Amino acid sequence: WSDCRFLFRLRNEDEVRKNSFQTSEIPYSSHENWFAQKLQDVNTVIYILERNGQAIGQVRADRQERTAEISYALCREARGRGLSRWMLSELENRLREDGFCSELYAEVKSENIASQKIFQSLGYREKIEEYGFSYTKHIPLFSILMCTYHSSATLRNALDSVRHQTRQNWELVILDNGSK
């Protein structure tokens, strides 16, 4: 239960509470129940970031259908080093590899400028909300990559070959090297 205790301490840090939508301190017994439920929930993934054997952050995704809501936090000593951006990028990669979801979603308070910048830098779509901002990002589960050679016939063949694709959550990437 060391992860449970770490997450409890992290969740109740002043800065984490300030950026959370639930700002009150959480009693350990409530947190312990929440943690036990999350561990059993197939729609939740939690990753603990460690450095030199010490837990320094967490990132979580809670899935509803094909969309997963992101929550993340770093302990005070780990902030300002680019780890949040790295942690969210790694989460995207793992969720894509596991086929966990096809879209990510996050809510950020208007005063949480650092998180806003992170989601913007990772290519999330930003929407203004009453509380601040919401961020969404489509993460295709696989890509179909086709090369064309500056030829409309090659491009047409590439499009025809995937037109009747029946798998969900895919994208077509067409590369054109410009040769004639």
Predicted regions and their residues:
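Donor nucleotide-sugar binding loop of glycosyltransferases
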Residues: 151-154, 179
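Hydrophobic/aromatic residues located in beta-strands of well-ordered beta-sheets
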Residues: 104, 172-174
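Conserved GNAT-fold acetyl-CoA-binding loop/helix
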Residues: 15-34
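Short, acidic, metal-binding catalytic loop of nucleotide-sugar glycosyltransferases
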Residues: 160-169
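Acyl-donor (CoA/ACP) binding surface of acyl/acetyltransferases
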Residues: 2-4, 10-13, 50-144, 148-149, ...
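A conserved acidic beta->alpha catalytic loop
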Residues: 161, 176-180
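A short helix-loop-beta-strand connector motif used in the catalytic cores of GNAT acetyltransferases and
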Residues: 36-48, 57
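Structural signature of beta-strand start/N-cap positions in the alpha/beta core
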Residues: 143, 169-171
